[in-house]
Amino acid sequence: MAYSTLFIIALTAVVTQASSTQKSNLTFTLADFVGDWQQTAGYNQDQVLEQGGLSSLFQALGVSVTPIQKVVLSGENGLKADIHVIIPYEGLSGFQMGLIEMIFKVVYPVDDHHFKIILHYGTLVIDGVTPNMIDYFGRPYPGIAVFDGKQITVTGTLWNGNKIYDERLINPDGSLLFRVTINGVTGWRLCENILA
């Protein structure tokens, strides 16, 4: 009888410990996302040109560019990913420079020989994100996710035949809540919180 009691106590302790561990994993902080966001926001030069829709422009201008990834805090609860594209002044005509300024509106001087444009690739906001939401990031197909305690539907669409999935989280009332764009080839994600 004593052995049975001890076994039950030990088993209860194990279950309780597992339960408390599981509960502790139900909340995430910004630090939990930093590594993944930096990795999935990483673009090489070809990806920046292609996915940023800039390939034809820079090919026509005949200039070499250097993309630099910047991942910064965006408030207390989000990460913002930008790509800073460094462009040399050398070799650009007045017409070409005017074209760049017309398209990108703002150019930023870097030094006497270079300027940059900034491509904004979205902000990841993590308020209310649950483990189900984490699972969703790797699923380029329809499913169910939980956001801020509410169950919502995820829909996946193929965009432009380029294996880019534009996935949306939709509230029960049909309003759009959160969007994640996943490139099925390279695996990068553009995460946008689109709450009004």
From Swiss-Prot:
Transmembrane segments: none
pH-activity relationship: Optimum pH is 8-9.
Record InterPro entries: Calycin
Description of how activity is regulated: Inhibited by micromolar Cu(2+).
Catalysed reaction equations from the record: coelenterazine + O2 = coelenteramide + hnu + CO2
Gene Ontology CC annotation, any one: extracellular region
Signal sequence bounds: 1-27
Compartments, record wording: Secreted
Thermal activity profile: Optimum temperature is 40 degrees Celsius.
Disulfide bonds: none
GO biological process, one term: bioluminescence
EC id: 1.13.12.13
Gene Ontology molecular function: any one: Oplophorus-luciferin 2-monooxygenase activity
Superkingdom of the organism of origin: Eukaryota
Note: The shrimp has luminous glands at the base of its antennae and legs, and ejects a cloud of brightly luminescent secretion from the base of its antennae upon stimulation.
Record function comment: Catalytic subunit of oplophorus-luciferin 2-monooxygenase. Oxidoreductase that converts coelenterazine (the oplophorus luciferin) to coelenteramide under emission of blue light with a maximum at 454 nm. Is also active with bisdeoxycoelenterazine.
Binding partners and assembly: Heterotetramer of a catalytic 19 kDa and a non-catalytic 35 kDa subunit.
The protein's name in its UniProt record: Oplophorus-luciferin 2-monooxygenase catalytic subunit
Native source species: Oplophorus gracilirostris (Luminous shrimp)
